[in-house]
Amino acid sequence: KELAQICAMHPNVYVAQTTCAHFNHMYRAMMEAMEFPGPSVVIVYSTCQPEHGVADNMAMHQAKLAVDSRAFPMMIHDPRKGNTIKERLDLKGNPSVKDDWYTIRKTDETINFITFARSEGRFAKHFDEDDNPSPELLASQHERLRNWNMLQELAGII
């Protein structure tokens, strides 16, 4: 469920979706949420290392990858910024905010939801012996892209 987007559709609610790997974004979100003169919701990504099959020392890396892959886009919805969603919704902090997927310039590697899924043991059953993703995983990637494109549209980026 897209809890942040659901909350943002309620009138006069400050909403942030952030991660511990993006400290400045998280700090800003927490400070603004506490200062907001109404209800605030701050959703912070946290991997469950044993259940997700992620090493104990990789929590920050995984949180960054969740954002980079569009699995968990960062956003801030601040009703004080204006009367329209475009004015209130801020996607700053996400990489390549105008693009569908983030591409690492040095390696030309595209980071997408499949990249994220490959990094977590819980998705291992969705890859065949040749490392090809299952139809379900490809559908999840398509859904993540649709969600990202909707956020871009709401924020007036596309």
PLM regions and their residue ranges:
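Conserved thiamine diphosphate
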Residues: 1-36
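Glycine/aspartate-rich loop-and-adjacent alpha/beta segment that forms the canonical ThDP
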Residues: 29-158
